[in-house]
Amino acid sequence: MLKRLLIAACTLLFAGSLLAATPAAKPHVLIATSLGEIEVELDPAKAPISVKNFLEYVDSGYYDGTLFHRVIPGFMVQTGGFSAGMQEKKTRAPIKNEADNGLLNERGTLAMARTGVVDSATSQFFINLTDNDFLNHGARDFGYAVFGKVVRGMGVVDQIAKVPTTRRNGFADVPSDDVVILSAKRL
């Protein structure tokens, strides 16, 4: 009897240590757009700051009603900073650039958009339409931090990439007809 209890206790301890060693689940977010749904998987193990930042914007409803404001076929589609009429949305403080995390700017990945200042990313992000090696860390500068990937709805992303664009309010590559994030929610 004592032997069985000892075996059961050891088994429980071993199972507990296995569970503790299991990496945290990768959060999924459903981005419902005016052209369809895009499901993304985030990588908090490799991009903890970017993922935390993105999820804070998602959870607050910040992305709801946000435009895809920069669409460049064969390159990327960008969103996260403007509402209807190209009105710039207020953001939180910039975050540290995690482009040195080993994740690459490959087709279907999400990366933080930024200015020429390395640590200037806030709410804007883009989805790569192709492998954009020149955006990777060290390719030409610090790079652009990848923090997730599209797991469903890449056809919607490709559809966004095909919309006609124009200049609007001093911005180039803006869709002629608004492409809008209707909602972004954790799954």
From Swiss-Prot:
Catalyzed reactions per annotation: [protein]-peptidylproline (omega=180) = [protein]-peptidylproline (omega=0)
Q: Is Methyltransferase among the key words of this record? A: no
Domain (PPIase cyclophilin-type) ranges:
25-186
The domain of life for this entry's organism is: Bacteria
**Looking at its record, which EC class is this enzyme?**
isomerase
Q: Sorted alphabetically, which SUPFAM superfamilies does this protein's record hold?
A: Cyclophilin-like (SSF50891)
Segment forming the signal sequence:
1-20
Where does this protein chiefly localize? periplasm
Q: Give its E.C. classification number.
A: 5.2.1.8
- Quote the InterPro entries the UniProt record gives: Cyclophilin-like_dom_sf (IPR029000), Cyclophilin-type_PPIase_CS (IPR020892), Cyclophilin-type_PPIase_dom (IPR002130), E_coli_cyclophilin_A-like (IPR044665)
Which GO terms of the molecular function aspect are on file? Answer: peptidyl-prolyl cis-trans isomerase activity
The record's Gene Ontology biological-process terms are:
protein folding
Q: Name one GO cellular component term.
A: periplasmic space
Q: Where in the cell is it found?
A: Periplasm
Question: Which keywords fit this entry according to its UniProt record?
Answer: Isomerase, Periplasm, Rotamase, Signal
Q: Does the keyword Isomerase apply?
A: yes
**What family classification does the UniProt entry report for this protein?**
Belongs to the cyclophilin-type PPIase family.
Role this protein plays? PPIases accelerate the folding of proteins. It catalyzes the cis-trans isomerization of proline imidic peptide bonds in oligopeptides. This protein is not essential for growth. Presumably plays a role in signal transduction.
What is the protein's given name?
Peptidyl-prolyl cis-trans isomerase A
Instruction: State the organism of origin.
Output: Pseudomonas aeruginosa (strain ATCC 15692 / DSM 22644 / CIP 104116 / JCM 14847 / LMG 12228 / 1C / PRS 101 / PAO1)
| Gene from which this protein is expressed | ppiA
